[in-house]
UniProtKB/Swiss-Prot annotation:
This is Small ribosomal subunit protein uS9. One of its GO terms (biological process) is translation. Keywords: Ribonucleoprotein, Ribosomal protein. Belongs to the universal ribosomal protein uS9 family. It comes from Yersinia pestis. Gene3D superfamilies: 3.30.230.10. InterPro entries: Ribosomal_Su5_D2-typ_SF, Ribosomal_uS9, Ribosomal_uS9_bac/plastid, Ribosomal_uS9_CS, Ribsml_uS5_D2-typ_fold_subgr. Pfam families: Ribosomal_S9. One of its GO terms (molecular function) is RNA binding. Disulfide bonds: none annotated. It comes from the Bacteria. One of its GO terms (cellular component) is cytosolic small ribosomal subunit.
Length: 130
């Protein structure tokens, strides 16, 4: 394998991403596809690039990413978390800046379970007076 490769695992909702950073030109490959092909939505692409733009390293690393589970938003968040962890493995002094932007903390919000007697987690059946 590469002599200087940095790894980070990211999670968000039900998605988990494995991120490998290698010194390069800024190429991003997600599940054998480019960032533009994998994420059609511009917002998801922006979320993925946030940690790199913050520390001015967009063109410094090539990224190989595998991501599983969840939807578009969850996967983008998981990748962002993974990139953040990999950047901290590369240079621990970036932690403060990334922490201030809120990228280091794992977003613990998960889907609330459906309750018996309710239509959804909190949505009650319609009330009828008569």
């Amino acid at each position: 394998m590469a002599e200087n490769q940095y790894y980070g695992t990211g999670r968000r909702k039900s998605s988990s991403a494995r991120v490998f950073l290698k010194p390069g030109s800024g190429k991003i490959v997600i599940n054998q596809r480019s960032l533009e092909v994998y994420f059609g939505r511009e917002t998801a692409r922006m979320v993925v690039n946030q940690p790199l733009e913050l520390v001015d390293m967009v063109t410094k690393f090539d990224m190989y990413i595998t991501v599983k589970g969840g939807g578009i938003s969850g996967q983008a968040g998981a990748i962002r978390h993974g990139i953040t962890r990999a950047l901290m493995e590369y240079d621990e002094s970036l932690r403060g800046e990334l922490r201030k932007a809120g990228f280091v903390t794992r977003d613990a919000r998960e889907v609330e379970r459906k309750k018996v007697g309710l239509r959804k987690a909190r949505r009650r059946p319609q009330f009828s007076k008569r």
